[in-house]
Regions:
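Contiguous, often N-terminal, cationic amphipathic patches that form binding interfaces
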Residues: 1-85
Length: 85
């Protein structure tokens, strides 16, 4: 599956901004069929960063991925690249 089909778009909510600042995480809407390994690989290839952990949440047919980045890759820098900040 293509990286751009796996990662649909980043989420910019109050909770996602709080997670970005406190836990070095970004939240993405992802394809419902994508698993954690696929999401991790797609994010690492798209943004050239190291991902520590991926948690997923499925609700009402939509899937969110909570991606935690390594300390050397601040989530705020990635959010700035995406235009979220």
């Amino acid at each position: 599956m293509d990286n751009y089909k796996i990662i649909k778009h980043p989420l910019s909510t109050e909770k996602s901004i709080r997670l970005m600042e406190s836990q070095n995480k970004l939240v993405f809407m992802v394809d419902i069929d994508a698993d954690k390994k696929m999401i991790k690989k797609a994010v690492e290839e798209m943004f050239k960063v190291k991902v520590e952990d991926v948690n997923v949440y499925i609700q009402k047919g939509m899937k969110k991925a909570y991606v935690k980045f390594a300390q050397e890759n601040p989530a705020i820098d990635i959010a700035t690249q995406l235009g979220l900040m």
